[in-house]
Amino acid sequence: MAEKFDCHYCRDPLQGKKYVQKDGHHCCLKCFDKFCANTCVECRKPIGADSKEVHYKNRFWHDTCFRCAKCLHPLANETFVAKDNKILCNKCTTREDSPKCKGCFKAIVAGDQNVEYKGTVWHKDCFTCSNCKQVIGTGSFFPKGEDFYCVTCHETKFAKHCVKCNKAITSGGITYQDQPWHADCFVCVTCSKKLAGQRFTAVEDQYYCVDCYKNFVAKKCAGCKNPITGKRTVSRVSHPVSKARKPPVCHGKRLPLTLFPSANLRGRHPGGERTCPSWVVVLYRKNRSLAAPRGPGLVKAPVWWPMKDNPGTTTASTAKNAP
């Protein structure tokens, strides 16, 4: 008698029918799907006997459900990478490890043009001006906190303007008396020499280098005829000049004492006037008369006149007998 060839679960005869052998038992397709089939981790449906099955680390998928978790590309016949319980294709794996654009928050993959600033990256077209929204790309820009501005918008909103040319100062600016200047605009009004870091003199809102001030602006000293200049950068300079005085005159001859370089100017006439050596006057203390003038060739030195009657001072007789 022939052995019965029946389904292990429903006992239906399997002769002439499709069946599946599972764990040493034979079962019809219907019972296989019901009792033996693995469940797809993607769609949560049984993987029937007539379906293709993909498995990885005790997990099972329909071949059509085995796709990249990012781009949904089918991976049944391709290489893949499992990361954080996700199945990824090679391209998405690269993107997963790639930096994210600060503008669109998408991955920057190999071949994408990008801009990097202080550890942050953007797609080239995502790096735009915070004001006008124009693409900055790889052009010049100015950072302001978390914002970035193109050159034009920065000049309009933030840049100082030169007091001379009224153009924006983007680099190389200087400040003088709380006013901003381009370094190329702050120059000597005469020779156009740059004055930044140099000594200069300001005269009525005009600025001169040291040489031009000496040659063209500075007043000349009445005594030495040299220019009156300051020793530091000031708006006004001064020169210590005494008021002009008439030269002292000899009481006797009424001649300027400058004609007598050897004159001792401390010798004085009793009236307080200075006397040249040729006209030394001798004062007699008692009668306060004047002695006759001595000849120019006979005078050797002026006489010192005592200002007070102190003991031991020169008397009239000693002055008279002086050689």
Swiss-Prot record:
<dbReference type="GO" id="GO:0010972">
    <property type="term" value="P:negative regulation of G2/M transition of mitotic cell cycle"/>
</dbReference>
<feature type="domain" description="LIM zinc-binding 2">
    <location>
        <begin position="101"/>
        <end position="153"/>
    </location>
</feature>
<dbReference type="GO" id="GO:0060371">
    <property type="term" value="P:regulation of atrial cardiac muscle cell membrane depolarization"/>
</dbReference>
<dbReference type="InterPro" id="IPR042997">
    <property type="entry name" value="Fhl1"/>
</dbReference>
<keyword id="KW-0221">Differentiation</keyword>
<keyword id="KW-0832">Ubl conjugation</keyword>
<dbReference type="GO" id="GO:0099104">
    <property type="term" value="F:potassium channel activator activity"/>
</dbReference>
<dbReference type="GO" id="GO:0007517">
    <property type="term" value="P:muscle organ development"/>
</dbReference>
<dbReference type="GO" id="GO:0009887">
    <property type="term" value="P:animal organ morphogenesis"/>
</dbReference>
<keyword id="KW-0217">Developmental protein</keyword>
<comment type="function">
    <text>May have an involvement in muscle development or hypertrophy.</text>
</comment>
<feature type="cross-link" description="Glycyl lysine isopeptide (Lys-Gly) (interchain with G-Cter in SUMO2)">
    <location>
        <position position="86"/>
    </location>
</feature>
<feature type="zinc finger region" description="C4-type">
    <location>
        <begin position="7"/>
        <end position="31"/>
    </location>
</feature>
<feature type="domain" description="LIM zinc-binding 1">
    <location>
        <begin position="40"/>
        <end position="92"/>
    </location>
</feature>
<dbReference type="GO" id="GO:0008270">
    <property type="term" value="F:zinc ion binding"/>
</dbReference>
<dbReference type="GO" id="GO:0005634">
    <property type="term" value="C:nucleus"/>
</dbReference>
<dbReference type="InterPro" id="IPR056807">
    <property type="entry name" value="LIM_FHL1/2/3/5_N"/>
</dbReference>
<keyword id="KW-0479">Metal-binding</keyword>
<keyword id="KW-1067">Emery-Dreifuss muscular dystrophy</keyword>
<keyword id="KW-0862">Zinc</keyword>
<dbReference type="GO" id="GO:1901381">
    <property type="term" value="P:positive regulation of potassium ion transmembrane transport"/>
</dbReference>
<dbReference type="GO" id="GO:2000134">
    <property type="term" value="P:negative regulation of G1/S transition of mitotic cell cycle"/>
</dbReference>
<keyword id="KW-0225">Disease variant</keyword>
<keyword id="KW-0440">LIM domain</keyword>
<feature type="modified residue" description="N6-acetyllysine">
    <location>
        <position position="4"/>
    </location>
</feature>
<keyword id="KW-0863">Zinc-finger</keyword>
<keyword id="KW-0963">Cytoplasm</keyword>
<dbReference type="GO" id="GO:0044325">
    <property type="term" value="F:transmembrane transporter binding"/>
</dbReference>
<dbReference type="GO" id="GO:0005737">
    <property type="term" value="C:cytoplasm"/>
</dbReference>
<dbReference type="Pfam" id="PF00412">
    <property type="entry name" value="LIM"/>
</dbReference>
<dbReference type="GO" id="GO:0005829">
    <property type="term" value="C:cytosol"/>
</dbReference>
<dbReference type="GO" id="GO:0099103">
    <property type="term" value="F:channel activator activity"/>
</dbReference>
<dbReference type="GO" id="GO:0005886">
    <property type="term" value="C:plasma membrane"/>
</dbReference>
<dbReference type="GO" id="GO:0005925">
    <property type="term" value="C:focal adhesion"/>
</dbReference>
<keyword id="KW-1017">Isopeptide bond</keyword>
<dbReference type="GO" id="GO:0030154">
    <property type="term" value="P:cell differentiation"/>
</dbReference>
<protein>
    <recommendedName>
        <fullName>Four and a half LIM domains protein 1</fullName>
    </recommendedName>
</protein>
<keyword id="KW-0677">Repeat</keyword>
<comment type="subunit">
    <text>(Microbial infection) Interacts (via LIM domain 1) with Chikungunya virus non-structural protein 3 (via C-terminus); this interaction is required for viral RNA replication.</text>
</comment>
<keyword id="KW-0007">Acetylation</keyword>
<dbReference type="GO" id="GO:0030308">
    <property type="term" value="P:negative regulation of cell growth"/>
</dbReference>
<feature type="domain" description="LIM zinc-binding 3">
    <location>
        <begin position="162"/>
        <end position="212"/>
    </location>
</feature>
